[in-house]
Amino acid sequence: MRHRNSGVKLGRTSSHRKAMFENLANSLFEHELIKTTLPKAKELRRVAEPLITLAKNDTVANRRLAFARTRNAATVGKLFTVLGPRYKERNGGYLRVLKAGFRAGDAAPMAYVELVDREVNTSAE
C-alpha cells in the first residue's frame, strides 16, 4: 500500500533528489523562469512555494530556515527583499507551469516554470 507516500522519486536517490530540487529552486529564484522536464516542474512547486511563503515574514528564524533549505545566501537575500514583499498579498500559487512540447533527444515532456508576477523584459531592440 502506498498510503501517505507523497512525492515522486524520479529515478534518483533521496540525496540526489534533494540536491537537484535545491538547485532547481535556486535557479528559479535567480532567473524567475526556467525550463525543465514536466515531472520535475510539478514536483518543484512543492519545494519552491513554501520558501516564498516563508519569505513573506522577514525574521531571522525564517531566513535561517530558508538558508537551510537553499544553501545559497544570494537566493535567501532575493527571497526576503524582492520576492517576499512582491507576493505579500497573494495566498499561494506563486508559480506557473507551462507545457513546452517534447525534448528532441528523448521526447521527454518539457515545461517552463515561472514566477507569476515576474517583470518581463520587453525591449524594443
UniProtKB/Swiss-Prot annotation:
KW Transport (keyword) present: no
GO cellular component: cytosolic large ribosomal subunit
Single GO BP term: translation
A Pfam family it matches: Ribosomal_L17
Alphabetical list of InterPro entries matching this protein: Ribosomal_bL17, Ribosomal_bL17_CS, Ribosomal_bL17_sf
Gene Ontology terms, MF aspect: structural constituent of ribosome
Entry keyword set: Ribonucleoprotein, Ribosomal protein
Listed HAMAP family: Ribosomal_bL17
Oligomer and partners: Part of the 50S ribosomal subunit. Contacts protein L32.
Family: Belongs to the bacterial ribosomal protein bL17 family.
Protein name: Large ribosomal subunit protein bL17
Organism: Acinetobacter baumannii (strain AB0057)
Originating gene: rplQ
